[in-house]
Structure formats: C-alpha cells, structure tokens
Amino acid sequence: MIQTNASGIIKRKEHARKGHERMKRRLISLVLVLMLVMTAGCGKKSTTKKLKTEDLDETTLQGMAKDITKEMSLKNKIGQLFMVSVYQLDEAESKNQTSVTSQMKKTLKKYPAGGVIMFAKNINTPDQTKKMTDELQDASYIPLFMAVDEEGGQVSRVASNPKMKMTVYPSAQEVGRTYNNKKIAQMGKTQGKELKELGFNMNLAPVADVLTNKNNTEIGDRSFGADSKKVADIITTLVKNMQKQQISATLKHFPGSGQTGGDTHRGSTETDQTINALRDTDFKPFKAGIKAKADAVMVSHLMLSNV
C-alpha cells in the first residue's frame, strides 16, 4: 500500500503537467472552473493567471485539493486509492504487454485507477515506453501516477534493459559504501530526469530500510546500510534531487523491513521489535525522507507483534 502526502493529488497533477502538456491544460481548466464557481455572481470583472503549485504554500495546496476532490464522484475517489499493473488493465493479454490495448482504455474509463505500475516486461525501447505512458495518460480523465521500480542494482526495471540506454547504478549497498553526497545527489537527479523523459512521474524508490539482520535476503543489498543515520542522510539527498525533476519519490518499506527474515512479497512476515526499537533505528530514514517532503510512503506487509 502507498500512502501519499496530504496534497498529493495536486502535486501529482503538477508533475504530470510538467511532463505532459495535455495534463497542464486539464489542471488549468479545473482550477479555472473552480475560480469561476467561487467568483460567480460577484458582478465584477476579474483577471486570472496560470497557477504553479511550486509557488503556493501548503495551506493553499490543501485548499485546492479539497476543492478538486469535492468535484470528484465517489467512484473516482475510490479509484484514486488503487495502483494497478498493466496486466490488470487487460487480463486477456499476456503479462508482457508493450502497447496500450482498447481494453486497457475501457478498463481505465470504467475503473478510474489512481496509478499504473510498469514492470521490465512492459519496457522495451525508449520510444515504445514513452508512447505507452502517454497513451495510458490519455486514456485516464484524471492524471495517473505512472510508476516504476528504479532503485538501482537488482531492482532496475528500466536500466536493466540495455536498449533503454539509461544510466546504470549499482546496488544501494554499494552506493552506501562508496558514494559521497555529491554522487548520491547526481544519482537522484539523473534517475529522475531519465524517468521523466520516458513519461513516468513516480519512482517506487528509494529503499529506506536499515539492514540490521544480515540474514535478510528480501532486502539484502537493496539497503543503503546498517547505520540508520547514514541511511537517513542518503534518503534525504535522493528524495530532494529526484523530486526536483518532478518525479515523486516513494519511501519503502515502512515501518522498516531491514530486521525481518521473511519475504513480504510472498505474504506477510512478523517482527517482535518494540515501538522504541523502531523509533531508535528503522523510523529514522523514513522521518528524514518525510522531512525532505517525499511524496509517498509504501507500507510493507509486516506484522508488529510487540507494538
């Protein structure tokens, strides 16, 4: 499950606006409609100008988010809670779809999902990927989160394909061991820029887990290390630089899967850590990422038996 920040819907529209001109027109049109509604009956001539969310404070964004959601149907609101795979939009096809089908468009119209995640099997070439993200956005009345897992190392859905010609980064473990802050900042910037060019607006990364269990094979080298402060510093740098490229960063896997022994991709797993232990270690990178204004947090299938 992914938790977005309070003004996520506005920021999502802004990210989409910067990556797709058609999204800009939708956002501006909606804002203008709201402004017309609020000023209707005033009897005074007024002028308007285009709004940019980066120029607005959090209170204003919260207000805009409330106004926009008031205009949405219950069905649309429920749909925004879901992120689906490409395959789930057209299950008649194989899981290796690399183009948008008519059924996918029909599904998005009937079930207005909040986002779509693409995997390596959906990503073939830069032109094909950009065409696919564009067409999925076109098929959705409400701008989509277009998401992908691009952590670096073994979880690199885009860079793992040589045809994509995307910058290849080593595992988080290697980054934590050998990269300085300048190189980490460049990594966040480069990943964000290259994903944006392909039509994505959300990266399901970085991994904020602190690896305190050396036998943890699920996280393993996907963690930046066992030092919670060092991991927190890396997360802060990555989030800030990635989001400067209009790519939403996603902190994962809350409340922290670095101490577990099971694989939450195959079910749930359990930890006996206390709340104080979590606060002392696991929570620190997430707190740092949230302070850096990360747009989203991914919640793990983790049971906390002592909390």
Regions found by a protein language model. Name each.
Residues 80, 112-114, 141-144, 200-201, ...:
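Short, well-ordered coil/turn segments that N-cap beta-strands
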Residues 23-46:
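Sec-dependent N-terminal signal peptides of Gram-positive bacterial secreted proteins and lipoproteins
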Residues 3-22:
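Short, Lys/Arg-enriched N-terminal segments with co-localized hydrophobic residues
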Residues 234, 239-251, 277, 281-294:
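Phosphate/pyrophosphate-binding betaalpha-module
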Residues 87-91, 97, 107-231, 253, ...:
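Enzymes and membrane/adaptor proteins characterized by extended Gly/Ser/Thr/Asp/Glu-rich
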Residues 44-71, 78-79, 94, 102:
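N-terminal, intrinsically disordered, polar/charged segments of Gram-positive cell-envelope systems
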Residues 62-69, 101-105, 126-133, 185-192, ...:
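Extracytoplasmic/secreted envelope proteins and their assembly/folding machinery
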